[in-house]
Regions:
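Rhodanese-like catalytic fold shared by cysteine-dependent sulfurtransferases
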Residues: 1-34, 39-83, 92-130
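Short, surface-exposed ligand- or partner-binding patches at beta-edge/loop junctions that are enriched
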Residues: 87
Length: 130
């Protein structure tokens, strides 16, 4: 049976859980070792990004997160047990991203509830994408 986008989003959220924007901000303020990965395409970052977030589009995630790939992004995906929070505009693509990296053995992945829009809606700071 074919899975729809909605099925994949629901599955990712159920399997990996979410973190609220306030909880993420608290962890960031406490300087917890956490990697925030924004999986939007570069041309969709005009709304702003969470400070310190790495941009790895969903399309490139498949090879950048794969430790076996010649194109593995070792700076962003350092260790399979590192805490990673995925975000996108609203959370859907982030849910799929969490499932993708879990297939590569990453065990500590979470989805930002509401995505970057949810972050902004709470009045939390954003910055312009580089």
């Amino acid at each position: 049976m074919t899975k729809s986008f909605s099925d994949r989003v629901a599955e990712g959220t159920a399997n990996h859980g979410t973190i609220t924007p306030a909880e993420l901000k608290e962890k960031m303020d406490a300087n917890e070792a956490i990697t925030v990965v924004d999986v939007r395409d570069a041309n969709a970052l005009g709304e702003g990004v969470i400070p310190g977030a790495k941009n790895v589009s969903l399309g490139t995630l498949f090879y950048k997160a794969d430790p076996q790939s010649a194109f593995h992004d070792k700076e962003t995906f350092q260790s399979t047990d590192q805490p990673i929070v995925f975000t996108c505009a609203g959370g859907g693509q982030a849910s799929i991203a969490a499932s993708v990296v879990a297939e590569y053995g990453f065990t500590n992945v979470t989805i930002l509830e509401g995505g970057t829009r949810g972050w902004s809606a709470e009045g939390l700071p954003t910055e312009q994408a580089e």
